[in-house]
Amino acid sequence: MRLMLLGGPGAGKGTQASLLINRYKIPQISTGDMLRAAIAKGTPLGLSAQKIMESGGLVSDDIIIGLVKERLKNPDCDRGFLFDGFPRTLVQAEALKDAEIHLDHVIEIAVDDEEIIERISGRRIHQPSGRVYHVVNQPPKNPGVDDITGEPLIQRDDDKEETIRKRLQVYHSQTAPLVQYYKEWAETGSKEAPKFHTISGTGTVEQIFDNIVTILET
């Protein structure tokens, strides 16, 4: 089972990815994790990436694809894998295709921007414990304070509306075109093309997961 999840920030990809890797016993392949592991091991690609990162540059798509190919040779990928945060751009998607790294399913978790903003901007954190609340979906007993300690809750900078809107802009300009790319490729009927599905990201975690599993196992 070789999978990719697409969707904006806050669409629930991370939650669903955790459930999927447990169900299908496949690893979650993250470019960040791969970079850190390659640098720690001192592999040639890792050393190349380290030099670029230390000079403040962006690691090239060639290096990223090389790391992906290395990672997929590991025995834990024999049953498949789930890509996390990769590819991010059309250039990376084309490079993945050229490298003959095949996917079985690409699933878009679709959530409206305003719903995403409400989800993320409503989060409140009790910093010392890490307890998370939501002003609408999971409010504290008393507004603005932790249920257990009575200490104030904070809103992280990453959860502020202005920051979320900027992240959504980046998503729509760079990553959202992947939806069209994989949709159009699937419509060609090519044997190499993964199956493409769009599901609603609105509902309970369990409902969304059940919808994904139905798609994968039908």
UniProtKB/Swiss-Prot annotation:
UniProt-annotated binding residues for ATP: 10-15, 123, 132-133, 203
Coiled coil: none
One GO location term (cellular component): cytoplasm
The UniProt record lists the keyword Kinase: yes
Keywords from the named record: ATP-binding, Cytoplasm, Kinase, Nucleotide biosynthesis, Nucleotide-binding, Transferase
UniProt keyword Hydrolase, yes or no: no
Amino-acid positions noted as binding AMP in the UniProt annotation, renumbered to this chain: 31, 36, 57-59, 85-88, 92, 156, 167
An annotated GO BP: AMP salvage
EC number, UniProt record: 2.7.4.3
The protein's assembly and partners: Monomer.
HAMAP family noted in UniProt: Adenylate_kinase_Adk (MF_00235)
Entry's family note: Belongs to the adenylate kinase family.
Swiss-Prot/TrEMBL domain comment: Consists of three domains, a large central CORE domain and two small peripheral domains, NMPbind and LID, which undergo movements during catalysis. The LID domain closes over the site of phosphoryl transfer upon ATP binding. Assembling and dissambling the active center during each catalytic cycle provides an effective means to prevent ATP hydrolysis.
Protein name: Adenylate kinase
Phylogenetic lineage: Bacteria, Pseudomonadati, Pseudomonadota, Gammaproteobacteria, Legionellales
